[in-house]
Amino acid sequence: GFGDDRIFIERYVEKSRHIEIQILGDEYGNVIHLGERECSIQRRHQKIIEESPSPRIDPFLREEMGQAAVKLAKKIKYCSAGTVEFLFDDQTDEFWFLEVNTRLQVEHPVTEEVTGIDLVAEQIKIARGDELEFVQDDIDWHGHAIEARLYAEDPGNNFLPEVGTLHAYDTSLASEVRWDSGVDEGSIIGTDFDPMLSKVISWAPNRVDAANKLARGLEKAHMGGVVTNRQFLISCLRNESFLNGNTTTDFIEREVLETKKNLSANELHQASTAIALWLAQKNRDSDPVTGFMAANWTNGRMPLQRVKLLFIQDEVEVKYKFNKDNLYEVMGSICEIHHCDSAGIDIEIDSHRFYAHVTKAGSEIIINMPFGDVNASVLPRFIEPGNDVPEGGLIAPMPGKVIDVKVKKGSKVKAGDTLVIIEAMKMEHSIKATEAGKVAKVMIQLLSLIHISEPTRQWSI
């Protein structure tokens, strides 16, 4: 291409890091650097965790790379805030120029946190013709800052973007970290824009404390309605290799990282108990008769109350009953509700008291437990006539993507034959023939997206 038949051969760098240098240059020829950021943890070649300073770069390398960036900027008479990006060889300490981003980067807050310099303000001052108010020797670095990018995407499905409505989004529960958000509760996440919901930044005197602080902040926030990479980020930040600074660009490929929150048996018990009693109290308060009765009222003859909950793969039937002294007995635990309203429940389970914020959207529940958000679905006690899709029905039981079409127009099938396979909620669902017949018309295509109850086949007997 370009009328040039020369071939460029680049050296293969087995263990590499993405290191970038923040610079400021004014129209008077003054250029300084504000140290490095490491942005090596990436998926699909896009950054998800950035930090400053890098755990790999020592003061000598910082000065060497910083001066290389300053020299380049002075050569082109650069005038603005900018980022000079380098490829760094983790084994040899060599580095190579990649590009200059002539703007503030998404990750610029980590530099602000460790230098105390407002980069947005400095960029505006430079643009209006002001001279830099400091020289290189004035720049110092304090502590460690880490930023995580919170995306509406599914790490368990190749980080594909997700859509939906944010039924819950409350970051006030995690005020110890900085949230730069572009969404609120009720925001509709679509496909027209980048799926980043927020960037979350922590600062601490040292790197391990900054990582732990950021992980806990992500964990404490209350959000749901759209699949995010939150648990994946938490898993990265708590990973031993990450904490040891082994963060080369192959980090995600070589480490075993959680894509979904895995609940212990005790955590599952606590979450299901809190949800069941919150639902019981909510239903009781809305009842015109029981809403006026004492909370511990019972006629002594009522059977155990039951509610079925689905937690990702775990289906739990919670059995509970009212006991004396305003206590509840739930699956062997003694529980007391200290306060309960539509926003959440203050509950004590086996002498362990905590408050859990609760959001309900249809049959979906998001409960903010001491160990983080837990998502569950309330399963119906009885299948409502007319609303269920019989097994083998020819309509889609849920929204999803067609990943396999087993038949075509004119195909003869027997009852029970698989016609279409749909992928939804990261599981495969087969639509089967309810009786023998011949396919009259194929109404969907491979890889097409279909909506719930959308027809997939017409056929004749």
List where the protein language model places each region.
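A structural signal for short beta-strand/turn segments enriched in small hydrophobics and glycine
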Residues: 210, 410-419, 424, 447-453
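Long, charged amphipathic helices and adjacent flexible linkers at domain junctions
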Residues: 134-142, 372-396
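A long amphipathic alpha-helix within ATP-dependent nucleotide-binding catalytic cores
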Residues: 2, 6, 51-89
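ATP-dependent carboxylate/phosphate-activation module, predominantly the ATP-grasp catalytic core
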Residues: 25-67, 104-119
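Single conserved hydrophobic/aromatic residue that forms the stacking wall/gate
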Residues: 451, 455-461
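Short histidine-centered loop motifs in beta-beta connectors
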Residues: 391, 395-397, 403-412, 435, ...
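Catalytic cores of soluble metabolic enzymes centered on carboxylation/carboxyl-transfer
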Residues: 69, 109-329, 334, 448
